[in-house]
Every structure is written in C-alpha cells, then in structure tokens.
Amino acid sequence: NKQPYVTMKYAMTMDGRIATHTGASKWITGEASRAYVMGLRNRHKGIMAGIGTVLADDPMLTCRIEKSTDRDTDNVRNPIRIVCDSKLRIPEDSQIVQTAGEIETIVATTAAGASDSAKCERLKDKGVSIIETEDVDGQVNLRQLMTILGGKGIDGILLEGGGELNYSMVSEGL
C-alpha cells in the first residue's frame, strides 16, 4: 500500500526548543518563513497536527497566500486537515471543527475516542471525518493511519506537529 510522503515542518529557538519558555510557538519565525510555509501548505495534499497543537494554539491549518501579480496564486487551495487525537479531545468550538464543512477535515482517533459516539456524531454533523485506528500505547496507530490516508489518495502530508507527534512519526520511520 502506498503511503503519503511526509514533510516535517518545525521552527526552533536558538537554544533548541520548539516553543518559548511560555509555551508560545506561533512567532518563533519571521515573515519570510511564514510565507514559505504557506507555499508548503499549498503544495501538500494534507496537513497533520496533534491534539496538543490544536488545544494550545486553536490553529486553522489553512493556506493563506495573498493574491499576487508576480507569482502564480491562481491555484491556491487548502490542504486536507488531519488531527491525531487518540481520546477525541478536540473542542467542538475549535476553528478546525467550526470550518470543517468548508475545508476537508479528518480526526484520527482510537477506540477510546470513538467510544464517545455522541461526540463522533456531532463532529460528523459539522463535516469532520473520523478515522479509527488501532491503539498503540494509548496513541493513534500512525503506520495504519498513513496506509488509510494513502488509500484516500493523500500522497503528501505537511507535518506541523508538536514535539510528541513529530517524535512519534520519526520513531516510526514515517
């Protein structure tokens, strides 16, 4: 089975951290880096984050490229948003859930998360697709998830995870 190619994106402070001492990670980089990341988002079919990032930052995970006359911006599109959330803790009022009807959104969870069938139904009603994977030490089975995503035609993923998801993906060789 074909699995997506994964590009891991992260910013790091001079002392090797991916967030400031307050936990803020949004403004470690500058304007040029953020513009580059928007281009990466536009080129990848999917974008993946963990529930920790969603809870900490309430991100949109969209492609925000300004219309421009000096470059090709006619084909700007949003990647499919993929959130790894083993216990289905994603807030129903998060920006990702609130915009799931407009931007394709997948939440990958385990049996523990999927056991909240009422929340699953509410998320589905808002446009979220739920993928249930096997449980690996209390976490989403990332290898199984990649196979499922590849089967859905997602050939490239921009990984914008925090330390935990990034470590897990690298450890699994994904």
Residues covered by each model-derived region:
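Gly/Thr-rich phosphate-binding loop signature of adenosyl cofactor/nucleotide-binding cores
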Residues: 159
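C-terminal structured "cap/appendage" subdomains that terminate the fold
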Residues: 173-174
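Active-site ligand-binding patch in enzyme domains
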Residues: 3, 7-14, 18-155, 164-167
